[in-house]
Amino acid sequence: YGKFGNEVFRKIETFRCPVIAAVNGFALGGGCELAMSCDIRVAADNAVFGQPEVGLGITPGFGGTQRLARLVGAGIAKEMIYTARNIKAERAAQIGLVNQVVAGADLMETVMKMAKGIAKNAPIAVAYAKKAINEGLQTDIDGGIAIEVDEFSKCFATEDQTYGMTCFLEKVKDKQFSNK
């Protein structure tokens, strides 16, 4: 069960395109772990986060111990997991668990605006940047920089790089990348 859940969440985490979680209401246990598998988390002001598993006699099983510590630091992750206490959206933003908190009525509009902003950029470059961040976090700083340099170099073999640089030099605002 835990292995299958982790496989699903890793697929989300390593999916080529950025994944944005829109959290409205409770994200506890697996729900919190699902949100942490996403690249960006936007929460409604009524959202509640937590890893309550130890109160049930189990540990987080879908990457919660690993992702939470990477997102908020080991000390806060241990406090949240060991106490099994839930936190509100504002606290989640303060500790870095979520990127942004908005009014519930504005949640989907905010997430869609963010997604459209990402989609305006070169898809290949965004995917390479995501890969560099994710893989770089699995190694030391020198290894991470080597990954970044590799992904950066690959961009120069794309039509989007040539087009993007040309648009910059010619001050073109409305770019239409080809994903090539």
Description of each model-found segment:
Residues 40, 79, 83-85, 91, ...:
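Well-ordered beta-strand positions
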Residues 42-47, 98-146, 150-159, 176-180:
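C-terminal long alpha-helix characteristic of the crotonase
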Residues 31-41, 45-46, 88-91, 95-97:
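Active-site-proximal glycine-rich helix-loop-beta segment
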Residues 166-180:
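Terminal low-complexity tails and localization/encapsulation signals of metabolic enzymes
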Residues 11-21, 40, 44-48, 125:
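A structural preference for short, pocket-lining loop segments at secondary-structure junctions
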Residues 18, 35, 68, 92, ...:
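Terminal peptide-recognition signature
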Residues 1-24, 71:
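An acidic, glycine-rich surface segment that forms the CoA-thioester-binding/catalytic face
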Residues 66-75:
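Hydrophobic, secondary-structure "cap" segments at the distal end of domains
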